[in-house]
Amino acid sequence: MIATSGNKNSERDYVDQAYIRASNLEKVISEYNKKLKSSDLRSIAMSLKSVLSENSFILATSLTEDFGAKGVGEPEKKSILEDEEAHLTELDDTLEAGRLNGLLDRVFSREFTYQTSMLISLEENILTRTKKDNLKSKLTTSISNLEQARDRLDAFEAR
């Protein structure tokens, strides 16, 4: 899930990765939402985008306040950024293939159900590692919101 270069990953590494992942997913939704055919799916996607935006804010605040990061989106381990860029490219390629095959709604709902689950898992990992009460509280709420969004995507996909 996170790049390893022989060094033990720190709590900050996971927060960096979660921030970059949430920000990237938000950008992908912005790009593909207008291409979705289903108004229900567009609504679900915009709701998820809002949750991801709040999530990014929480993680960015934690990076600067709790970890003293000079800038967000600039992880200490460059391999994290490289891995997330590769992950973003793979997601974009999958969605574009779905669009070209006339299956974007189906591919989008499947991929974002999966991507949301991956982000939840990453944030749960942070939650078990952190001793920062403020971050714990905010992540607990964020995870709950992500789970609700994932459940809506899952319900759409099951139709």
Regions found by a protein language model. Give the residues of each.
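His/Met- and acidic-residue-enriched segments that coordinate or traffic transition-metal cofactors
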Residues: 1-159
